[in-house]
Amino acid sequence: MAHEQATYTTRPGAFTARGHELTALGDELRVGDLAPDAELAGRGFVPAPVRISDYRGKVLILSCVPSLDTPTCDRETRRWEEERRALGGDIEMLTVSMDLGFAQARWCGAADVTHTTASAYMNQQFGIDYGVLMEENRLLGRAVFVIDRDGRIRHLEYVREQSTEPDYAAALAAAREAAAG
């Protein structure tokens, strides 16, 4: 039985880690694109599914990070938690990493993070569809997507250097604008 080879775009140098270039798999999304749906694994040892389409009808800030157990991802996810608490109920927050669900649950409990986190470890296609899967380590590259109520991308940022945090102000402004209109 012949296996079909997966075909997708490779983007050498799309991400860096302390200057070392990394290759992203998948196309970059663009503002106006329909956000790809995906089923991710929620927190816990037997994780419940989390779907991007579950957020239709709400504005979603989707944060992709390599691992919650790294200093930059830790700071970023805690910051998104602070921002989420100040936002209205029409804006949801989802952080996706490649961490196992029970590791996410442990980290979130220790960090007092209550917004939804999910893992793409069982579905690397999510990383390809969003253009954030790094070929060299199979982790997600840092990125932020603001998705409106209709599932369209209103703002995105692919953060090239993985030790750099995203532009929170730009993402928050886009989320507030999407929620208002």
Where is each model-derived feature located?
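Chalcogenol-based redox active-site neighborhoods
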Residues: 1-181
